Curated annotation (Swiss-Prot):
Pfam family, one: Guanylate_kin
Location of the Guanylate kinase-like domain: 7-186
UniProt GO molecular function: ATP binding; guanylate kinase activity
GO CC, alphabetical: cytosol
Xref: InterPro entries: GK/Ca_channel_bsu, Guanylate_kin-like_dom, Guanylate_kinase, P-loop_NTPase
Classification via PROSITE patterns: GUANYLATE_KINASE_2
Identification of the protein by name: Guanylate kinase
Annotated localization: Cytoplasm
EC number: 2.7.4.8
Keyword ATP-binding appears in the UniProt entry: yes
NCBIfam families, sorted: guanyl_kin
Enzyme class: transferase
Lineage of the organism: Bacteria, Pseudomonadati, Pseudomonadota, Alphaproteobacteria, Candidatus Pelagibacterales
Family as reported in the entry's similarity comment: Belongs to the guanylate kinase family.
Length: 210
């Protein structure tokens, strides 16, 4: 008789525009991860689908969820609230299903501090350069230069939290970045060897923040 295993949790965080949402969708499709759908008080972006990409709610609804202690994690990002409700995540993990989170460093810290009895692997995604990040943000649905400038300021602060993650991956090529994350997840699950150069990452962060 086989012993049922609990699912694992994988967190992907990154500065805005570094590509984590695309990577989360790839991992969900190719590695059978359930994407944890966050609640948010911001308005939908172009091509975002309610109840698939996010649960779009007003501030009162969000505050009620906080009051009722329904969030596994929540944070304020760019003047909007984001949060992950506990029950859907725990239900999936207990059934042996894996869950992947697209959240920022604040949410990642909260989940780590909860010390849940499930395996957790955390990744921080970096752009290859500040110039490429600026280009990505400018080409997205952000025609307002002030918004792009705000994102770049936040980047300088957010990137400092890389040290709190298990792995930091540079997204200079989407397929290669996905492959690295996928291999590291497999190695973590199977207790295999992990090809990861932390000194190289440290030097890259120093270059990004100089």
């Amino acid at each position: 008789m086989s012993i049922k295993k609990d699912g694992i949790m994988v967190i992907l965080s990154s500065p805005s525009g570094a590509g984590k949402t695309t990577l989360v969708k790839l991992l969900s499709k190719n590695k059978n991860f359930h994407i944890s759908i966050s609640h948010t008080t911001r308005k939908p972006r172009l091509n975002e689908i309610a109840d698939k990409d996010y649960y779009f709610v007003d501030h009162d609804k969000f505050e009620n969820l906080i009051k009722n202690e329904e969030f596994l994690e929540y944070a304020k990002v760019f003047n909007h609230l984001y949060g992950t409700t506990r029950t859907p995540v725990i239900e999936k993990l207990e059934k042996g299903e894996n869950v992947i989170f697209d959240i920022d460093w604040q949410g990642a810290d909260q989940i780590k501090n909860k010390k849940l009895n499930y395996k957790l692997i955390t990744f921080f995604i970096l752009p290859p350069s500040k110039e490429i990040l600026f280009e990505r943000l400018s080409n997205r649905d952000m025609k307002d230069k002030l918004i792009v400038e705000e994102r770049m300021k936040e980047f300088s602060r957010d990137v400092l939290h890389w040290i709190n993650y298990d792995y930091v991956i540079i997204n200079d090529d989407l397929e290669e970045c996905y492959s690295k994350i996928s291999s590291l997840i497999d190695a973590e699950i199977n207790n295999g060897s992990k090809d990861y150069d932390k000194d190289f990452i440290r030097k890259h962060v120093e270059k990004l923040t100089s």
